Amino acid sequence: MQPNVFMWGGLLKSILDSDLHIILDIVRSSKNSRYNRNKIAGAGEESWLTIPFVDFKREKLIMNQYLDTSESTKKKLINFFKSRYSDAPYYKNSLQILETSLDFNNTKTNLC
């Protein structure tokens, strides 16, 4: 299994079902993978939610890739969440958790 930014049901199930779960960070990365994106349902449709890479290079190992964690990316993710879930139960609590989780100290963060 390679690192993923977003936890999803299949990943959690595989972790729970395994005796030993190994995350590989010494493999090559691919640009259109799920390392930095995931499909999110809401507002009657599915959309890709992506945290962009900074200076992505295919030949780099996953452990050497960085995600763009700038303020503009943070705002984009929060606005994405607001536009799809503002009418959902527990919206305010979930938004608070999201904002806290996105409180990065750097403009780029290592994927691993």
Regions found by a protein language model. Name each.
Residues 1-112:
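Residues lining hydrophobic/aromatic ligand-binding pockets adjacent to catalytic sites
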